[in-house]
Regions:
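N-terminal Rossmann-like NAD(P)+-binding domain of SDR-like oxidoreductases, especially those catalyzing
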Residues: 1-184, 205
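A glycine/serine/threonine-rich, flexible loop-to-helix segment
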Residues: 138, 189-197
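Alpha-helical substrate-binding/gating segment
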Residues: 168, 194-207
Length: 207
């Protein structure tokens, strides 16, 4: 019989976080989801999960390091998924310090908390294809040279190297993946690719 794991998902109200929460609940695990107090009215992506017995909302903020430490120390999660992000490249030029804090400094703080209080936890950190900048190659992997051209991409690149360092120096169980644009029916229409896919769907259905 598979062990029932404790899963902590940062950014649980977003596209990726909510899908991960649903998957983990289907696997009969216990899911804790980080939700900002300011986001209490934006729970549409997890409304069907809120009353499930193995789903627990944890109030905190990616930049409120005390709340992250409190939650991780209390839960001692088996797995941590960091889907919380400021993922608008354009916005990162307008709010550079905030963007870098969210995409880079917060990740380092999470790694420090894991190292000090929950070293057996597995940690998953998503990266971004924006780290490659204007790469001329049609396909990229970790061997491709990083060339960040935005604060958002710079933060993701910093997070990548921080995760590599904590994995090699401290032996933490850190995993990652480089994300490219990916769509679903719940992705906000403020994203260009979502606008495109929704327009295609309207054309297909003759609307």
């Amino acid at each position: 019989m598979n062990k029932k794991k404790k899963i902590f998902i940062l950014g649980v109200t977003g596209q990726d976080g909510s899908f991960m929460a649903k998957l983990m609940l289907e696997k009969k695990h216990i899911v804790y989801g980080l939700v900002r107090k300011s986001s209490t009215g934006n729970l549409s992506n997890i409304k069907e999960l809120i009353h499930k017995k193995n789903f627990f909302i944890q109030h905190g903020d990616l930049l409120d390091f005390a709340s992250l430490e409190r939650i991780i120390r209390k839960i001692k999660p088996d797995e941590i998924y960091n889907f919380a992000d400021q993922d608008h490249v354009r916005w990162s030029f307008d709010i550079p310090f905030y963007s870098f804090n969210v995409t880079a400094n917060a990740v380092i703080k999470i790694l420090e908390i894991i190292k000090n209080y929950s070293p057996e936890s597995k940690f998953f950190q998503p990266y971004s294809s924006n780290m490659f900048g204007n790469s001329i190659n049609k396909k990229q992997d970790e061997l491709e040279k990083f060339s960040p051209l935005s604060i958002y991409a710079l933060g993701k690149t910093t997070a990548y190297y921080a995760c590599q360092m904590y994995k090699e120096v401290y032996g933490l169980k850190i995993y990652g993946a480089i994300f490219y644009n990916h769509e679903s029916e719940i992705r906000p229409e403020e994203y260009v690719t979502r606008k495109i896919t929704k327009s295609v769907a309207r054309i297909f259905y003759g609307k």
